[in-house]
């Protein structure tokens, strides 16, 4: 459950280390984002020679949440922290590698590239 001002780790090789959610996309009154939702983020911490710089604003898709996501069979998939993957204007991943597991809920037409790059799909 990600809301405005939430800090997230970055699960790709763009050079960003941590980001902060500045907007949850999908409606003017929408407050929370879960796995698979697109948010606007500001880069808060970045590697010196990465693709992105501190202070830049990007779209990102949430790939892991500590709150977890409930499946149809009643199971709950939780993670130790919150993580996102940075996207460009066409909602394609900027990085070429994904670190850590992602959930099966990302397996939609929009985010198949992220699922194929991920080392593990839960």
From Swiss-Prot:
Q: What PROSITE patterns does the entry give?
A: RIBOSOMAL_L14
Question: What SMART domains does its record include?
Answer: Ribosomal_L14
Query: What SUPFAM superfamilies does this protein's entry cite?
Result: Ribosomal protein L14
User: Which InterPro entries does its entry note?
Assistant: Ribosomal_uL14, Ribosomal_uL14_bac-type, Ribosomal_uL14_CS, Ribosomal_uL14_sf
Q: Which terms are listed as keywords in the entry?
A: Ribonucleoprotein, Ribosomal protein, RNA-binding, rRNA-binding
Look up the record and give one Gene Ontology term from the biological process aspect: translation
Give Gene Ontology CC terms.
cytosolic large ribosomal subunit
One GO MF term attached to the UniProt entry: large ribosomal subunit rRNA binding
Q: What does this protein do?
A: Binds to 23S rRNA. Forms part of two intersubunit bridges in the 70S ribosome.
HAMAP family cross-referenced by the UniProt entry: Ribosomal_uL14
Q: Fill in the subunit field for this protein.
A: Part of the 50S ribosomal subunit. Forms a cluster with proteins L3 and L19. In the 70S ribosome, L14 and L19 interact and together make contacts with the 16S rRNA in bridges B5 and B8.
Family (UniProt) = Belongs to the universal ribosomal protein uL14 family.
Name assigned to this protein: Large ribosomal subunit protein uL14
């Amino acid at each position: 459950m990600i809301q405005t001002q939430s800090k997230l780790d970055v699960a790709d090789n763009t050079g960003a280390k941590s980001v902060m959610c500045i907007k949850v996309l999908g409606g003017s009154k929408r407050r929370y984002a879960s796995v698979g939702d697109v948010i606007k983020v500001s880069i808060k911490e970045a590697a010196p020679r990465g693709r992105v710089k501190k202070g830049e604003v990007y779209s990102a898709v949430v790939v892991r949440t500590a709150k977890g996501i409930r499946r149809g069979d009643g199971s709950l998939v939780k993670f130790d922290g919150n993580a996102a993957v940075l996207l460009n204007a066409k909602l394609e991943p900027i990085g070429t590698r994904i670190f850590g597991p992602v959930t099966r809920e990302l397996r939609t037409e929009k985010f198949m590239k992220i699922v194929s790059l991920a080392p593990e799909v839960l």
